[in-house]
Regions:
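Extended, charge-enriched "interface" segments that sit outside catalytic cores
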Residues: 1-15, 114-292
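Conserved alpha/beta-domain cores
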Residues: 16, 24, 61, 76, ...
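A nucleotide- and high-energy phosphate-metabolite-utilizing enzyme signature
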Residues: 23, 50, 71-74, 78-82, ...
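Extended, Lys/Arg-enriched charged tracts that mediate electrostatic binding to polyanionic substrates
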Residues: 24-69
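Short helix/loop capping segments that flank catalytic or ligand/cofactor-binding pockets
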Residues: 48, 79-86, 92-94, 222-225, ...
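Short acidic, Pro/Gly- and aromatic-enriched capping/linker segments at domain boundaries
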Residues: 53-79, 198-211
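Catalytic or ion-translocation cores adjacent to nucleophile or general acid/base/metal-coordination motifs
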Residues: 84-115, 322-342
């Protein structure tokens, strides 16, 4: 095949690696390609294969719950990389959100072209009609863009307005989706209506595939894990506590001193120390991302070179310093890596 010959020839003529060290942006682009392209495409097929296997073995059709999600630390791995910090965390989260919403917009547009059912030929669920009327009222400009000859195509009309709402979500405007669950609710409404009104072979399969993708990728594409060395935390704490010998103190002593800060009973003073301010910015960014990108956008906070419980308390205390608080607790999944360089 000429295409195989061409690909192999071009590959042999290309260096295995660039002599230029990749930037954080290069790494993010590389990982983002696989998340938003091959993995995005194959996730529904994986669920379908698993459902078919379960039915083949047990003879029962099952609706699978969410089984799969993805995570990355590109843009969030600060350990030993001075180019990674609050700015790259924010940029990665925003880029991933834009990527996945753009894919949803394309899929919704394709569904709108496919689902051309007219009210004179087949009924739709009353709840779908109510949702359509609600969206027409909330997004009059988008509703006015629907062609008059499509006015009696409820699925197409609703999907057009879903696409408009996704565009508002992309721009983080008020009428956009607050969470991917709201998008799932709209798509599930369409899927249920199709199944109830002779649509099993008239588009339900394609809607189910998009539902599967939204469950897996949300509005974040992949959770962003964050990692930092415990010694960087110690540097910041030494400045905040005014204790130059902080890092060399016994783990039990450090834990005892950190408990009131980790629980919120005590507060660190303001500091202009570089280590303290950079970590404060990281935790503030993680706090803000929960509001702008959803609670699923960020994953683990990984502590490399952890030695004791004091290192976990250090992260809790620093997170409070950065304002990452929900109620009385710190909404952070901390994963200490107990390791040494020996």
């Amino acid at each position: 095949d000429d295409r195989i010959y061409m690909a192999l020839s071009a590959g042999w003529q290309t260096a295995e690696a660039s002599p230029i060290r990749p930037t954080v942006q290069d790494e993010h682009h590389h990982v983002g390609f696989y998340l938003a392209n091959p993995l995005y495409r194959v996730v529904p097929a994986l669920y379908e294969s698993l459902a078919e296997a379960l039915q083949s073995v047990y003879g029962v059709a099952v609706r699978l719950p969410k089984l799969l999600g993805f995570a990355t630390w590109v843009g969030g791995d600060m350990d030993g990389n001075p180019n990674v910090g609050a700015d790259t965390i924010a940029a990665s989260l925003t880029s991933q959100r834009m990527q996945v919403i753009e894919h949803y917009q394309a899929d919704v547009a394709a569904l709108a072209r496919l689902l051309s059912q007219t009210e004179s030929r087949v009924a739709v669920a009353p709840e779908l009609q109510r949702r359509l009327a609600d969206y027409r009222e909330r997004m009059p400009q988008a509703a006015a863009s629907i062609r008059p000859r499509h006015a009696d195509m409820p699925y197409r009309c609703l999907l057009t307005l879903i696409g408009a709402r996704l565009a508002l979500t992309q721009d983080q405007q008020t009428d956009g989706y607050a969470s991917s669950q709201d998008l799932l609710d709209d798509l599930q409404l369409i899927a249920d209506s199709l199944l109830q009104h002779h649509g099993v072979h008239a588009g339900a399969y394609s809607v189910e595939r998009l539902l599967c993708r939204v469950r897996s990728f949300g509005f974040h594409l992949a959770r962003l894990d964050v990692r930092q060395d415990s010694r960087v935390h110690d540097d910041a704490l030494a400045a905040l506590l005014g204790d130059a010998d902080w890092a060399s103190r016994d783990g039990a002593e450090r834990a005892e001193r950190l408990r009131p800060y980790a629980s919120g009973e005590a507060r660190f003073p303001d500091s202009d120390d570089d280590s303290a301010t950079s970590l404060q910015a990281v935790f503030t960014t993680l706090r803000d991302s929960r509001q702008s990108h959803g609670v699923d956008a960020t994953g683990l906070y990984i502590i490399s070179m952890a030695r004791s419980a004091a290192d976990v308390l250090a992260v809790l205390a620093l997170a409070r310093y950065g304002g990452l608080i929900k109620g009385d607790s710190v909404p952070l999944n901390i994963a200490p890596l107990f390791e040494t360089v020996d």
